[in-house]
Amino acid sequence: VLPYNKMFCLCKIRNPFAIFTRKKRGFSSDKNFMVDGIDITWKDTVQFAFPINGGRVIKVYDADTITIASKLPYDNSPLYRLSVRLHGIDTPEIKGNDVTDDEKIASKNARDFVSNLVLNKYIRLENVTSEKYGRILADVYIGEIHLNSLLLKDRYAVSYDGGKKTKPKSWLHYKNTGEI
């Protein structure tokens, strides 16, 4: 055990929570790096995509985020727990500072709809990439049913391209009328 004066102490840092922020300090897309003896830039790299094409749904957090259990395509792969966000859609949020009662009700309805379709079932993933929070981003299929499109068609979701979200003033009104 180190004596107190030799231990790392967050109290010496002006803003100790700054070490947990997501700011990209020191990031430059035109800076060169050496990787395995090769001089590269950010643009020479590609975003990682999980080598996965499906799994069994073990949790439905909300209508656009599920958790699957799956192995990776190599011998003796352990069974991984992976968070998957449905590509191209946004659904009502269950939690958050600005979540209204209307949105909570709509969110639970949408989550229950998805849960009844996919929970404990095998789903297929297509167009697999990663999204900004590290989750898998994919088109989800149950048999031949494209879940992402079904949620849009049945008005449990709105289109979302990864940028600024445009959500309905009332999710329940949107579900009934289609008016955003």
Regions found by a protein language model. Give the residues of each.
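Small beta-barrel nucleic-acid-binding modules, primarily SNase/OB-fold domains
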Residues: P3-I180
